[in-house]
Amino acid sequence: KRCNEVAVVLNEVRASSKYKLYDGNYEDILTYKAEYNCESMLESNRIFDASNSMDEFSFFEVMNHWRTDKLDMSGSNNQFNGTGWGFMVPQKKLYDAFVQEEGVDGYRLNQTMKTYDQISQLGVKVAKGQSLINEGYFMWKRRFSNVESPAGFWCSYNNYRWMRYAEVLLLAAEANLKDGNQSEADACLNEVRQRARLDAKTATLDAIKLEKRLELCSEYTRYQDIIRWKDAEALLKDQGERTPILSNKAGKDEPDNVAVEYIQYNKDKTRYGFKERHYLLPIPAKEIRLNPNMEQNAGW
């Protein structure tokens, strides 16, 4: 609704030339190797001090890291942290979206996530007799290395990245498109695509939505985007219906037998998926009791 105002501000940021897209290895863009790079716009500093590790106490990396208690990482040369809870699990439909846009050998795809076959070649496998919630894909740009956690799994000196220039470019592409400035929208979109080694394309809202989904996956913008775009009902209508289980059914002395199966725990359709009412939270009952003129949000 305020696309012109937004476009003006974002175009000023772009015209200032204070920021540019990081041109190092894309896989390092969120790691300690690329702290305070030219793309970082808002970043929290964390200090490498093993003698005061509790000052960096955080479960952030542990939650984002793979579900390590279900994995055999003995062949990985100790390069990955051995403690992870596996909360950051890419879905197959995200991988498929990458492949459709970039191909199986896509540069950004392969520096963003790894398939099970790829991760097993790095010495990380599902342990025999174990299973975890996963469709066979592992987030790579959020990998938790031992180097960045010298005092234990609860700490890391890798900085938090809250916003980077690629997000500004994609916001600018959207704002300019809605404001009628097609050439500026094209330029912003294709600056991101060029870094991803993709051909230029005309900026449409669908193209911008896709690019943002791929470029910023695992960076906590997706849910907010699909809420404001009013896409959540369509995209999340079946969320939670089935649970993917990646298992290694091999016995101790048997060759690995790893496969994904889907289990449906939720039979009642009212208990899973995004509904129209979820765009707004319910107003607490106490507030309604205190103010009889207040009406509850629809669906609650």
Regions found by a protein language model. Name each.
Residues 185-257:
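C-terminal structured "cap/appendage" subdomains that terminate the fold
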Residues 276-300:
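Extended, compositionally biased alpha-helical segments that mediate assembly or anchoring
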Residues 1-60, 149-165, 178-186, 198-204, ...:
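Structured, solvent-exposed acidic/aromatic patches
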